Amino acid sequence: MTANNKPKNDRTKILVVEDEGDMALLLELALDSEQMIVDHVHNLCDARDFVDKEQPGLVLLDNRLPDGLGIDFISYLKRKYPQIKIIMISGVDPAAEDAALATGADKFLRKPFTKSQLHDSISKVLN
């Protein structure tokens, strides 16, 4: 059991899809806790493989990735795994927020953001 009396296997599995190494590391460090299991991939191809095998509870998804746009991946996730929650993280394109939410993202988090904003967004999406 963890400190909050949840069984370890009841922890939320989170997939971070982010190609920038520093940002991915910051996200992993910010999310490191007994309530979450955090995995990271660098591109959409690996994200699709991971989701098909592991079906995480939440995907933190960058928009501009080496092999495509995260917005396009949202459609795939919502069609195949509607129960998976999605938070789009982006700072490049202001129009991405409207597109991400219209496509099915549960929340949009604009870079840069604080650890508190990240945790608040995750709490709102998962609860």
Spans of features found by a protein language model:
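Active-site residues of response regulator receiver
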Residues: 62
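Short amphipathic alpha-helix used as the core "switch/output" element in two-component signaling
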Residues: 71-81
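Non-catalytic signal-transmission and effector/linker regions of two-component phosphorelay proteins
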Residues: 1-15, 116-127
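Acidic catalytic/metal-coordinating carboxylates
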Residues: 43, 69-72
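Acidic, metal-coordinating helix/loop segments flanking the phosphotransfer/catalytic sites
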Residues: 40-58
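Alpha4 helix (beta4-alpha4-beta5 surface) of REC/receiver domains from two-component response regulators
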Residues: 72, 92-109, 120
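Two-component/phosphorelay signaling modules centered on CheY-like receiver
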Residues: 20-39
